[in-house]
């Protein structure tokens, strides 16, 4: 936090934010069904994910929109925002999409993102060439995209 306040605004709007906030129950019963298995998932049948009961098309879009904004601009009051991430180490790897994705997936999911998903992220990143001579904004956009795609993976969302 740049000002020491660590202020995170309300995140309960599912269309633009996380769809949940501290001390605000997602259901009137204040609990998730413990055996919940989402329909049509790629998860193993024995995997239960109770917290996915609040997941739907709107909340998924809101989650991605929230992350896209937070990854690039930070969160909190002010301009620049009160809390922003430093991508210095990632910028050093920006011309090597594979190394960048490997680092991001290691940091965000303890290496749980599958090789297939990592390859898909690398392929997406390589659609926009980035060289040492590229502008800082182009380099940052590649880092932002790598972080966003890693955070959209089920292996990031369901950490073991």
Q: Where do the model's predicted regions map?
A:
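Flexible, low-complexity segments enriched for small/polar residues
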Residues: 1-160
